[in-house]
Amino acid sequence: MSSSSWLGCLLAVLLSALALSQGLPLLEDLDENSFPDGRIVGGYVTDIAQVPYQITLRYKAISSPENPFRHRCGGSIVNETTILTAAHCVIGTVASQFKVVAGTNFQTGTDGVITNVKRVIMHEGYNSGAAYNNDIAVLFVDPPLPLNNFTIKAIKLATEPPLDGAPSKISGWGSTYPGGYSSNQLLAVDVPIVGNDLCDLDYENFIDETYHITSAMLCAGKRGVGGADACQGDSGGPLVVRDELHGVVSWGNSCALPNYPGVYANVAFLRPWIDAVRAGL
């Protein structure tokens, strides 16, 4: 191989490594046996009764059938048979690789209600036009979840975008710091909505032009301050404003950085697709 070819290959590897280290979806890929004390970044311990729409989506690889199902992503209960999560949580998988656990404060263990995923429908426009664009998927489960309005409850889907600056709540079992261990106990954090125009400016020089904010996304975070955010393991989970599901945890530059708000799938914008899938269209 010529020196110029070798240098070209090296540059490609370095650029790939840079991309993988920054614009990652907030997907869990950690050792589930290690849970240090701490919080979701900048957040607090919560109880499932405060966020009864929250589920843990557990997964195992087809190549390792002997392994237990383990937390991969979060999700939200739409009704007793329907869960909303992120497309990047389910891409390249089949339904039998997942179980949904509702009504639990913990990402491990057998408490709560466990049900099977029977069908996975990922947005056909995922990653089209921008990285992580249309990052949403619908899961159908069976047997149906026993909704009880206390620890297992459906959440209303937004039909209008939230106001800039509106307070929102994110919950999940994600890392308590970038690249750190996930939390075994359910955590939550409160962050304001950031307008898409400002958020797009923040990500203007991030990696390359494929990383930009589209209408199918919304942003939230303490802009210019940081310190509060979703993180790895929170993917697919809920962002809630005034008791309505407005966002699905999607991606960002690391976690809780002051100049990079977290990015979420925009439920109100994607609502026609969600409704069509639920109607079987």
From Swiss-Prot:
Active site: H88, D135, S235
Major localization listed first in the record, in broad terms: secreted
Disulphide connectivity of cysteines: C73-C89, C199-C219, C231-C255
Gene Ontology CC entries for this record: extracellular region
UniProt-listed Enzyme Commission number(s): 3.4.21.4
Ranges where the Peptidase S1 domain occurs: 40-279
An annotated GO BP: proteolysis
Keywords per UniProt: Disulfide bond, Hydrolase, Protease, Secreted, Serine protease, Signal, Zymogen
Site entry (Required for specificity), positions: D229
Reaction catalysis annotation: Preferential cleavage: Arg-|-Xaa, Lys-|-Xaa
GO molecular function annotation: serine-type endopeptidase activity
Cited Pfam families: Trypsin
CDD domains: Tryp_SPc
Compartment(s) of residence: Secreted, Extracellular space
SUPFAM superfamilies named in the record: Trypsin-like serine proteases (SSF50494)
Top-level EC class as recorded in UniProt: hydrolase
Signal peptide region: 1-23
Positions of the propeptide segment: 24-39
Entries under InterPro entries matching the protein: Peptidase_S1 (IPR050430), Peptidase_S1_PA (IPR009003), Peptidase_S1_PA_chymotrypsin (IPR043504), Peptidase_S1A (IPR001314), Trypsin_dom (IPR001254), TRYPSIN_HIS (IPR018114), TRYPSIN_SER (IPR033116)
Family named by the database record: Belongs to the peptidase S1 family.
Protein name, per record: Trypsin zeta
Species this protein is from: Drosophila erecta
